[in-house]
């Protein structure tokens, strides 16, 4: 896998984000048995202001969010609950999966509210973003079930507890 990490907000520790991205993206590809290619992924570590601009520009939602993804290929399943099309290397040998942006502010806020470690939450959001690059989504109920099940399985391989279990406190 070829990973390019771009830091726009100095609060992100470049080495830590690169390590977390490497773990999350690699674990996702391995779980889906897609680790044979040199897939290319770019991760942008930014703040709420930048991700709000991106969210407004690409999704017409002018507010911050935790993570955004831009798949290089259209892989989404046509039917609710269907499997996405596997990614392919193009005729020029390009193995780009796409780009992910993650907001420091929203990530830290969500981790604190959920009483989870920031590191685990970052890895969760990067797994989530990578699944979006691979055609998975959570808009339709059947698709959401598949995506959440994959997230829980991948995070389990990373030693991270199920993020969808609600806990009362620390």
UniProtKB/Swiss-Prot annotation:
Its cofactor is Zn(2+). Its EC number is 3.1.-.-. One of its GO terms (biological process) is rRNA processing. Binds 1 zinc ion. SUPFAM superfamilies: Metalloproteases ('zincins'), catalytic domain (SSF55486). It comes from the Bacteria. Pfam families: YbeY (PF02130). Signal peptide: none annotated. Keywords: Cytoplasm, Endonuclease, Hydrolase, Metal-binding, Nuclease, Ribosome biogenesis, rRNA processing, Zinc. Zn(2+) binds at residues 128, 132, 138. GO terms for cellular component: cytoplasm. Its main location: cytoplasm. It is an enzyme of class 3 (hydrolase). InterPro entries: MetalPrtase_cat_dom_sf_prd, YbeY, YbeY_CS. The keyword Membrane does not apply. One of its GO terms (molecular function) is zinc ion binding. It is found in: Cytoplasm. Belongs to the endoribonuclease YbeY family. Single strand-specific metallo-endoribonuclease involved in late-stage 70S ribosome quality control and in maturation of the 3' terminus of the 16S rRNA. NCBIfam families: rRNA maturation RNase YbeY. This is Endoribonuclease YbeY. It comes from Ruegeria sp. (strain TM1040) (Silicibacter sp.).
